[in-house]
Amino acid sequence: MNAHSPAAKTAIVIGAGFGGLALAIRLQSAGIATTLVEARDKPGGRAYVWHDQGHLFDAGPTVITDPDALKELWALTGQDMARDVTLMPVSPFYRLMWPGGKVFDYVNEADQLERQIAQFNPDDLEGYRRFRDYAEEVYQEGYVKLGTVPFLKLGQMLKAAPALMKLEAYKSVHAKVATFIKDPYLRQAFSYHTLLVGGNPFSTSSIYALIHALERRGGVWFAKGGTNQLVAGMVALFERLGGQMLLNAKVARIDTDGPRATGVTLADGRALTADMVASNGDVMHNYRDLLGHTARGQSRAKSLNAKRWSMSLFVLHFGLREAPKDVAHHTILFGPRYKELVNEIFKGPKLAEDFSLYLHSPCTTDPEMAPPGMSTHYVLAPVPHLGRADIDWAVEGPRYADRILASLEERLIPNLRANLTTTRIFTPSDFASELNAHHGSAFSVEPILTQSAWFRPHNRDKTIRNFYLVGAGTHPGAGIPGVVGSAKATAQVMLSDLASA
């Protein structure tokens, strides 16, 4: 066997979130003996899962788009994702609700969508169609052409720049939407998506309008049994391919020898060696903590600290004795303010008095997520990260949860608090302590234009040449399609490096 063939090589991937799992599958599929090391007792990263009183709670991502990107992981070795995962369509994609009673069902059926747009403002129909065409353009340019390109060289960014400038990528999503649509509610409806990947609609590049086209093309889906079942399916595929996963295996450091990574040392003292090391962990954690013993780690951590980080989330999981009627799978409950609230979420310096909420009600699509007749939910509020607002979440968390439950009861689910079976909160402090998230950020580095593509942490380190990044902190960014795309980009680099070694 050729000493430089992929089959002769080994890799360690740190972190069994979606990005780490997707990368490990790609490497193992290419014949690289891959070990996936996960600090927690279950795989999934942010997509953790737990059971409580018969309720099945997904901890993290709940919106599955671009199913073809997931199916590709199975197709690499001639397998079918349906063997391990059942995807269920979600309709409407989202239900948007405002104080005062306005409701907009974000659906994929063009006639239904346009009929609702006309009810808000008939004059915006033509503008919406032009926005739809624009979203398709940026989808082709930003997602299809560039979404899995590893931007390792400035020349790659310069090559992409003319098309991005033509598409006015320097404008924010909201500003671009506003050039097509005049109604303020509809402007919110077609710009809020960036919040789902950690971006401020008023500063995130208009390239992210591609999400509208991505959802129209591929739909919005839910994994039967919960997002955790997508994780379980990916683990099953990885292990069938011969990959090894270690749980309760916290990495204490990435070992190096000069400009090369040689493996990892676990917190229990075990040392693992490999030809290549990749990390799906928080990008600051990688450099500050795991590589903090190196000059590269120290210098990179300093530069990362100067970057803008995405907001955090306050997450409240709860079960109900009853299944509420007429509640959509995904509901966005806007507050009385939009731009002002979003700016306070991203800039601090304190927790706002009002909030906008995202409610996940999976039993609408899959009743088996709760005991018969009951329902499982989680609600989240975007909040400032720990570097923007000095909030004692041990004190504020329970109070904030009470305010959120009261709001849900008033606006959407009557008698909610009387029907509670269980609750659990996850705060920015938990993001920091349990997920090593810098500042408790829920989505890593904020996806503004000057922190995207080549400007984002690269998929391969420039100094430690066999150390690679995958996940939300590298190109293209957060969200399931983003981190799965980052795995494809990173795998390309790793396999290319092996081939040229």
UniProtKB/Swiss-Prot annotation:
InterPro entries noted in UniProt: Amino_oxidase (IPR002937), Carotenoid/retinoid_OxRdtase (IPR014105), FAD/NAD-bd_sf (IPR036188), Phytoene_DH_bac_CS (IPR008150)
A molecular function GO annotation: oxidoreductase activity, acting on the CH-CH group of donors
Intrachain S-S bonds: none
GO biological process, one term: carotenoid biosynthetic process
Domain of life: Bacteria
Annotated signal sequence range: none
Record PROSITE patterns: PHYTOENE_DH
EC number: 1.3.99.31
Chemical reaction(s) catalysed: 15-cis-phytoene + 4 A = all-trans-lycopene + 4 AH2
Pathway per the UniProt entry: Carotenoid biosynthesis; astaxanthin biosynthesis
Record keywords: Carotenoid biosynthesis, FAD, Flavoprotein, Oxidoreductase
Amino-acid positions noted as binding FAD in the UniProt annotation, renumbered to this chain: 12-45
Cofactor names: FAD
Enzyme class: oxidoreductase
Protein role: This enzyme converts phytoene into lycopene via the intermediaries of phytofluene, zeta-carotene and neurosporene by the introduction of four double bonds.
Family stated for the protein in its record: Belongs to the carotenoid/retinoid oxidoreductase family.
PANTHER family given in the database record: B-CAROTENE KETOLASE (PTHR43734:SF3), PHYTOENE DESATURASE (PTHR43734)
Protein's name in the database: Phytoene desaturase (lycopene-forming)
Gene (name only): crtI
